[in-house]
Structure formats: structure tokens, C-alpha cells
């Protein structure tokens, strides 16, 4: 198969769909790989690194799309990229369609087969291609939150871990999944006062066993969330409904009760965000303030630590890329129902039911 890797063009997105090591694996399996010039420069891979392992460097994204059957990316295709997709193309990348109807309609119009990293499943029901970026975003959320709590950034002027004689900051983490647990690990490492909220009692028990006395856990009812945001200096939104839009857990009314200079970090912004006042921001302009509360809602948080993120993502995606290249999309999905769960769009139709429901579009099973 002919596989293409275009340079990412989303704002401040430095990751790359395939590292030279991943390209080497594809070439060794008999596939051709076309890489847009400078695609790897964001993580310090020059074109020569790709050429050494057998890739062909092409000057533009248009050349990548023209020469390739499968397009491997990191973030959702931008309008100029969607315009280059054809029915013959297989697109493998993060899509997050539930919060992006224009993208969904563009992909439907293209006729391409689009498999989303974030809805590929594993035998255990986990999301193996979302996990590495959730780990990164969870850990980053505490770094970011601590930064914006500084007075110079407009924050409350609070040190997460406090000092002897001064209480630490209270951190409320909404969601005890992969992002939430990684946020908790970072926050407890800084000696913050951490509580994780979730609606799954079994998960809360697991978290209690994992962290012991270093955190508190609580069931995520409306009342407990309202009290949590009122008391917390830092709130992390880390909820996920696979494929669907994130639930709005923190309302505008709750926001008005929060301390001035406190910080919200919405990891779920890719899926529409879990705060009523959330709107997607960029690394160029990452925060805004409503009712005295700082909102950080950057939709590609891991892009800020591109090298770590790119390697972590490639470790997870490579086996699936190889399977798709070796067998073709139809045969690969027929053989692997967990990969088939990643199919979001094909033949001009929405193939993922939660996505269709979120966008109020027709769901047509593959």
C-alpha cells in the first residue's frame, strides 16, 4: 500500500503521524511511504531521517494525498486537507467528530473511509489509541493549572502543594479514567489536596486502592460537583463518553460560586468540553476568563510536548497502521472488530452511532 504522512497544520501542532522508526517498519513490510517535506521537524526529525529508512519526500501535502492510498495524521483534517480527500482514500487519525459537524459533513462529502483513533477499542473495552494522549493531557493539565494559578498569570496566587504552615491548593478532578488518574498522579506528586469524582463506584474503589490516603474520592452527583468547584482552586475536566459529546458537568451558575482566580482545565474540549462555559482555544491564545475564573481549553494539549506525544502515539498506532496497510481497510476491519469500532465515516455515511446522535445525523451501520 502507498501510505502518506502530511505535515500537521493545526495551530501549534508539532507532532507527526509517523516517526522514522514507524516508517521503517512499513517499508520493511513492502509498503511505499510518502512524507511531506518538513513533516517531522517539529520533533527534530529532518527529511533525511525519513529518506534513510526508505521514505519518499514530497514537496507539498497535495503530493502526499495524490500519491497515497492511506493518509496517517495526528489531528483532525483541516478544511484544506478535507478538500484533498477522495473516495479511494483511507484516513487514519484523531477525528473527534461529535463536536465538529462541519468536519463530519466534509468527510462525508469526500467519500473517504475515515477511521478515528479515539474510537478504536481493545478486548477489555479500553481505548488504546486515545490512552497515550490522555496520559499526556492528564499530566499536562496539572502543569498548566499550576502555572495559571500564579498571580502573574491572573490566577489566585496559590502554590499547589502549599508550604509548611500554609494549606495546599484543592484540586477537583472530574473523571477517574486515564486522563484523570494521570492528573491525580501529578497533583499528588506536588502535594496538592486532590479529590477525584466519578459516577462509577467500582472505579472509585479502584482509585482508592491505587492511591490510598493520598487522595479522596467522591461520587459525581450534581450536588457534589457543585460543592467541589466552589471549594477548589483548580478543576480538571477529564470525562469521556467514547465517540459522543462530553456531558456538561459544571454549569454557568456553578462557575459564579468559584473563587476569583481559580482555574478550569478542560481536557474534554476535543469532545465539546465538560464545562458549560468552555470553548476551544489554541496554544497561541490558550486562556480566557469568565466570572473571574480562568479557562484553559486548548484542543491539542499534547502538541505542546510534541516529542513525547509523537513517540507515545506511534507506539500505540503502529500495529494498526501495519494491519491496515497489509490487509486493506475492509479486510483489516473484518478481521479485527476492535479496529472496526474506529470506523466513523465511509461511503458518505456516518458509521459510528454516538457520533451520529451527537451531530443529529443519520447512523448507517457499515
Label each region the model flagged.
Residues 6-45, 152-240, 287:
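Glycine-rich phosphate/diphosphate-binding loop of Rossmann-like nucleotide-binding domains
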Residues 23, 47, 82, 104, ...:
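Generic hydrophobic/aromatic pocket-lining and core-packing "Φ" positions
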Residues 76, 136, 177-178:
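Residue-level detector of alpha-helix initiation sites
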Residues 118-159, 269, 274-366:
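Adenosine-phosphate binding glycine-rich loop
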Residues 2, 8, 79-169, 298-300:
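Glycine/serine-rich phosphate-binding loop and adjoining beta1-alpha1 elements at the start
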Residues 2-106, 110:
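An N-terminal-biased, well-structured beta-alpha scaffold segment characteristic
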Residues 69, 75-76, 95-96, 221, ...:
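Short glycine-/small-residue-rich Rossmann-like dinucleotide-binding loops
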Residues 209-291:
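Rossmann-like adenosine-cofactor binding region
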